C-alpha cells in the first residue's frame, strides 16, 4: 500500500471514528444515567448552586479541582454549620453527601450492612485494580493485628524502630559535623520513614535494603495514582482503565515479592514444623509480617501458602503505615523551622526531650514518657489541624434504602456520605488566629487545665491521638486509625532524633518562610521540592 493510499484510508477511518465517538459517548451517558447513576432526592441542596438546581454546573465541578478549600469553607458556612445536609461534587463523576457533625453519632451507630466503611474506602482507593482484589480491605485482618497485637507491644516494637531511625538518619542525612548539607525534605523523610516502618513490618535485615524500600514506595505511589485516575473514571470504563493505570504498579509489586520471598519461604517452613497453637519461641522475630503468617496459619490457611496474596497484604500494610506519616512529619519539620524565630520552637522541643527522655540517644521510649511530651504532641496536633492531607472523614457507603437524616434527607442506596474536617479545624469561632501555625497552642491549654485526683488533665482530649467529630485527621469512632498510637511514638522519636542530633534551617532564599502547601483537588500536599539545610551537631 502506498503512502498516499494509507493516508487516505487513515483519514477516512479517523473521520468515521470522529463521527461515531459522540454517539458512543452519548450512549454511554444514557446507559450510565439509566442503570448506574444515583438518584438524589429533590430536597437535597447542591453546594455552590442556587436553590432548586438539580445538577452541578461545570464551574462548580471545576472549583473542586482548582479552589476546593474555598468550596469546602463555603459549604461549611452555608450548610454544615447550620445542621444541613448537602451534596458536593467529587473526583471525576463522583458526588459526595456531606452531613453535619450533629449526624455523626447516628451514622457511626449504624451497622456495616447499612452504612459500609469498607465499601467507601474501596471506592476511594480502588484496591480491585491496584492490588487485584477487594478482599484486602473487605477482610483487613492485618489491621486487626495492629490493633490487637502490635499496640499491646508498642514499647518493644518502638525499640527496634528507634534503632532503625538512627541508621536511616546516618545513611540518608549523614554525619558531617563540619559542613551544611541541603536535602529535599520530602524525599529524605520518605526513605527514613519507610526504613523505620519496615523494621516494624518485615524486620531486620530486609528493612535495610534500599532496593526494597524504593520498591515499596513505587507501590505506594502506584496505589495513590490508581485511586485518583481509576476513581475519576466512570464505573463502566474502570475495567478498561484500571488495568492500564496499574501496569507499572503490578511490576513494582513483583519487585517487592522478589525481596520478600526468601524470608517468606524461610518463615513458612519454620511455622510448618510447629503447632499453630504453640507460643512463639522467645527468639522468634516479632515483626508484623511474622504476626500475619502466624494468624494466617491459624485462621486463613489458604492465604498462608499464597505468596502473591501475602505480599499484597504486606504492601497494603506498608501503605497504611507510611503514607500519612510521611506527609505529617514533612509538614512538622517545615512548621518547626518556620515557627522557631517567634516561638523558640527548636530549643523548647530539645529541652522537653532532655527532661522526659534524657540526653542519651539510647534511652528507652515508654508509653508514659511519650504521654509526657505534650509540647511535641502539640506541634503534631497543630500540624494535623492546619495541614492534614485529608479534609473529610468518617466515610460510608449507603447499602440500604430508608435512612433519613435529621433534616429530612433520605440517603439514596449507593450514595457516599462523609463529614467535613478542615473547615471545622480552622473555624475562627473555635480557634484564635485559625490560619496561624502556633506550635504550642494545645500544650498551653493542657498545661493550664484543671487536673483530677490522679493528676490527669481535663484537656487530655486535645492530645495528638485523640479524635472527635470536630477533629478528623485520624477518623473517629470504631474505624478510626488503629495505628495512630504507633504513629504517636514514631513522629516524636523522629523529631526528637532530628533536633537532638542535627541543626536545621531553611535555605537563604526562603527568607525564613516555609514554602506553601499545594492543593490537589481536596488533598493538601506538602510543597514539592521543599529543601532544608542540615548539619550534624558535635
From Swiss-Prot:
The fungal sesquiterpenoid aspterric acid (AA) is a submicromolar inhibitor of dihydroxy-acid dehydratase (DHAD) in plants and is effective as an herbicide in spray applications. GO terms for biological process: secondary metabolic process. It comes from the Eukaryota. This is Cytochrome P450 monooxygenase astC. Its main location: membrane. Its cofactor is heme. It is a single-pass membrane protein. Its EC number is 1.-.-.-.
Amino acid at each position: 500500500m502506498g503512502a498516499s493510499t494509507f493516508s487516505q484510508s487513515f483519514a477516512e477511518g479517523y473521520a468515521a471514528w470522529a463521527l461515531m465517538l459522540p454517539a458512543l459517548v452519548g450512549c454511554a451517558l444514557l446507559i450510565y444515567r439509566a442503570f448506574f447513576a444515583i438518584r438524589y432526592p429533590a430536597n437535597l441542596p447542591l453546594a455552590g448552586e442556587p436553590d432548586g438546581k438539580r445538577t452541578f454546573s461545570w464551574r462548580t465541578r471545576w472549583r473542586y479541582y482548582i479552589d476546593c478549600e474555598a468550596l469546602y469553607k463555603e459549604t461549611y458556612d452555608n450548610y454544615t454549620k447550620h445542621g444541613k445536609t448537602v451534596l458536593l461534587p467529587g473526583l471525576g463523576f463522583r458526588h459526595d453527601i456531606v452531613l453535619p457533625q450533629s449526624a455523626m453519632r447516628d451514622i457511626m451507630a449504624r451497622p456495616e450492612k447499612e452504612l459500609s466503611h469498607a465499601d467507601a474506602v474501596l471506592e476511594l482507593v480502588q484496591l480491585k485494580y491496584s492490588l487485584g482484589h477487594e478482599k484486602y480491605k473487605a477482610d483487613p485482618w492485618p489491621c486487626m493485628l495492629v490493633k490487637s497485637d502490635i499496640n499491646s507491644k508498642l514499647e518493644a516494637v518502638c525499640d527496634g524502630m528507634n534503632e532503625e531511625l538512627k541508621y536511616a538518619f546516618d545513611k540518608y542525612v549523614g554525619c558531617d559535623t563540619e559542613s551544611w548539607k541541603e536535602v529535599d525534605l520530602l524525599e529524605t523523610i520518605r526513605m527514613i520513614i519507610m526504613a523505620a516502618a519496615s523494621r516494624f513490618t518485615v524486620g531486620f535485615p530486609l528493612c535495610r535494603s534500599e532496593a526494597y524500600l524504593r520498591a515499596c514506595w513505587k507501590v505506594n505511589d502506584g496505589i495513590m495514582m490508581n485511586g485518583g485516575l481509576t476513581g475519576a473514571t466512570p464505573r463502566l470504563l474502570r475495567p478498561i482503565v484500571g488495568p492500564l493505570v496499574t501496569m507499572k504498579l503490578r511490576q513494582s509489586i513483583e519487585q517487592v515479592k522478589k525481596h520478600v520471598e526468601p524470608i517468606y519461604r524461610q518463615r513458612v517452613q519454620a511455622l510448618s514444623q510447629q503447632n499453630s497453637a504453640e507460643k512463639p519461641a522467645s527468639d522468634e522475630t516479632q515483626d508484623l509480617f511474622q504476626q500475619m503468617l502466624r494468624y494466617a496459619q491459624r485462621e486463613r490457611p489458604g492465604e498462608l501458602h499464597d505468596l502473591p496474596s501475602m505480599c499484597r497484604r504486606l504492601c497494603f500494610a506498608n501503605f497504611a503505615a507510611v503514607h500519612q506519616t510521611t506527609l505529617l512529619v514533612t509538614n512538622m519539620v517545615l512548621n518547626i523551622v518556620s515557627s522557631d524565630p517567634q516561638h523558640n520552637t527548636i530549643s523548647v522541643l530539645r529541652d522537653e526531650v532532655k527532661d522526659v527522655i534524657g540526653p542519651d540517644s539510647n534511652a528507652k521510649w515508654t508509653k508514659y514518657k511519650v504521654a509526657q511530651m505534650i509540647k511535641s504532641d502539640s506541634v503534631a496536633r497543630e500540624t494535623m489541624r492546619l495541614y492534614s492531607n485529608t479534609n473529610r472523614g468518617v466515610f460510608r457507603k449507603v447499602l440500604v434504602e430508608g435512612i433519613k437524616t435529621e433534616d429530612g434527607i433520605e440517603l439514596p442506596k449507593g450514595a457516599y456520605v462523609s463529614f467535613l474536617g478542615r473547615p471545622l479545624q480552622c473555624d475562627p469561632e473555635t480557634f484564635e488566629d485559625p490560619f496561624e501555625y502556633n506550635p504550642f497552642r494545645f500544650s498551653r491549654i493542657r498545661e493550664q487545665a484543671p487536673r483530677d485526683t490522679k493528676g490527669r488533665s481535663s484537656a487530655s482530649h486535645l492530645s495528638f491521638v485523640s479524635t472527635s467529630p470536630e477533629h478528623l485527621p485520624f477518623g473517629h469512632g470504631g474505624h478510626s486509625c488503629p495505628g495512630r498510637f504507633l504513629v504517636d511514638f514514631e513522629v516524636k522519636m523522629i523529631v526528637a532524633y532530628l533536633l537532638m542530633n542535627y541543626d536545621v534551617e531553611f535555605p537563604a532564599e526562603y527568607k525564613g518562610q516555609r514554602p506553601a502547601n499545594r492543593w490537589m483537588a481536596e488533598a493538601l500536599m506538602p510543597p514539592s521540592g521543599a529543601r532544608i539545610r542540615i548539619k550534624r551537631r558535635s
